[in-house]
Every structure is written in structure tokens, then in C-alpha cells.
């Protein structure tokens, strides 16, 4: 596989299927930096200032849990990331000079200005997990305002096949995550532009060769009380054409694309482009 992709397209040629695919997370990798971080931080600050209600929502009453997680992330930055200086509740990202204090606004809003990860707080209530706070600056065609306060089944309702493949497993799987063993997974999509802030889908007329490979690296960390989960999302957008630097990866990903059923193609906004993408990979 080309070394360009941070998280490359699947190379196993297996048919696409919905799965959680959880893996144990090394605490040293809870937060990811990367060459795109500085540019992302500029976008994040601007969007927090101009579209706050779009990118931040909360249910009142969960501030303490959010602050506890924010402080844990702050300590993690201090321990594992030399580009940060931490003093009390203040965090400075040295390359940009951005400084925030977790107590001067909602802690997720503050933290989101110095890391690339979006942050969602889930609370276990009424035998399910509910989204009670979130900073989602780079949504992939979904709107935080529509999801806040809902449980995980309602949040994932639009995903084709979710009810049969994942709904029976989600709550139990989340319940089994232990505070001592956080987990991570990844997700992918193909987009017509490199824009990461895409709360709604807007069609663009682009050449197939100009599509973008979008990945989400997601983590789940349970609180010591077992009542809360912090869900983080690290978004990246990279030129899809990089895949052609690896002949095996190209041919195997064709099989994955060909396995997508009409409902999933429509959900991923690839119904019109799938044939062109496959031909692009084959030629």
C-alpha cells in the first residue's frame, strides 16, 4: 500500500459489511497529531466562532463529566505530545501559539481548538447510550443539532442495515468496554471535495480522479463510574488517486466497491459515481 495514506483503503478484497471492528487503544495514541493539524486548527477556530450552534451542542447537567474527560485529555497531551505545554487547566499548542483554558468556556469547546479530534459525550440512561454533549466541527453529512439528546440506535437509524447488523450488539458492546481498556475503530467514505465540514451533502461536479478518501479514526473511553463514554473522531481527507500507486490495493478495493448494495451506495452518496470509480481503478 502507498505510504501516503494514514489509514489506507481496505486491501483484503472482502465484501463490505457493517461491523464495529473495535481494537484495544494504546493511551499514547488517544490523540493523533499529523501534518494536517495546523491547518485543521485554523478551520476549527473559525467554525467555532462563526457556526457555534452547528458544531457545538449540549444537554445541561453534564458539565462535570465533560470537564473530567477534558482534563484527562489535557494530561494525556502533557504526557505524550511534546508540542503542548500544560499549566493547570491551561493548554498551549506550541506550533500555533493557541492557548485555551478549560474553565473559560465549555471544556469541549476549548479543547477542540487545540486538537483535531471532535468530541462526543455519551451517558448511559434508560438502558441505552445517549448523546449529551458534543463538539463536531467536521461532520460527514450529518447534523449535530439533529442528533443531540438521542440514543445510539436513533442516531444510527439512517444507516442501511444497521437494525439487523449492529443494533442488537451496540448497547451490550458499549457496556462491556472497561475504563482500563479503551478501544478504537475506523470508518471510511469517498467525497467529491476535501472539505471536512460537511453537515449536509452538496453535489459537486468533479472528475472521478479528483475524489477524496475520507477517514474517521474513532476512539471510545469509558469513565471510571461506567456511566459515560467519550467518543472521539479524528478526520482526514486525502486524494483517492493515491490508491493507484499500489496495484494490489487498487484491484482489491474494486471488489469492496462492487460489493456495496444499492442502499449503501445511496447512503454513501456513490450511487451515481460507483461505476466511474470502479472503471477508474481498473484502468
Q: Where are each of the predicted segments found?
A:
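Extended, well-ordered protein cores
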Residues: 1-283
Amino acid at each position: 500500500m502507498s505510504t501516503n495514506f494514514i489509514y489506507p483503503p481496505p486491501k483484503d478484497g472482502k465484501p463490505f459489511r457493517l461491523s464495529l471492528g473495535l481494537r484495544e487503544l494504546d493511551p499514547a495514541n488517544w490523540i493523533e497529531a499529523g501534518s494536517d493539524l495546523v491547518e485543521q486548527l485554523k478551520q476549527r477556530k473559525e467554525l467555532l466562532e462563526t457556526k457555534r450552534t452547528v458544531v457545538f451542542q449540549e444537554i445541561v447537567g453534564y458539565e462535570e463529566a465533560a470537564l473530567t474527560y477534558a482534563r484527562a485529555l489535557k494530561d494525556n497531551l502533557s504526557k505524550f505530545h511534546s508540542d503542548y505545554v500544560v499549566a493547570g487547566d491551561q493548554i498551549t499548542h506550541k506550533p500555533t501559539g493557541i492557548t485555551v483554558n478549560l474553565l473559560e468556556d465549555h471544556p469541549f469547546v476549548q479543547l477542540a481548538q487545540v486538537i483535531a479530534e471532535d468530541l462526543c459525550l455519551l451517558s448511559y440512561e434508560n438502558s441505552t447510550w445517549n448523546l449529551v454533549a458534543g463538539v463536531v466541527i467536521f461532520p460527514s453529512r450529518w447534523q449535530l443539532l439533529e442528533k443531540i439528546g438521542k440514543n445510539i440506535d436513533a442516531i444510527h437509524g439512517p444507516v442501511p442495515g444497521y437494525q439487523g447488523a449492529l443494533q442488537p450488539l451496540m448497547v451490550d458492546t458499549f457496556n462491556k468496554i472497561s475504563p482500563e481498556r479503551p478501544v478504537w475503530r475506523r470508518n471510511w467514505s469517498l467525497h467529491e471535495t476535501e472539505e471536512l465540514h460537511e453537515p449536509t451533502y452538496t453535489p459537486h461536479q468533479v472528475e472521478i480522479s479528483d475524489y477524496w478518501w475520507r477517514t474517521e479514526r474513532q476512539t471510545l473511553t469509558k469513565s471510571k463510574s461506567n456511566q459515560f463514554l467519550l467518543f472521539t473522531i479524528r478526520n482526514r481527507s486525502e486524494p483517492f488517486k493515491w490508491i493507484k500507486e499500489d496495484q494490489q490495493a487498487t484491484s482489491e478495493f474494486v471488489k469492496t466497491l462492487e460489493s456495496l448494495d444499492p442502499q449503501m451506495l445511496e447512503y454513501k452518496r456513490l450511487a451515481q459515481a460507483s461505476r466511474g470509480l470502479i472503471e477508474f481503478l481498473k484502468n
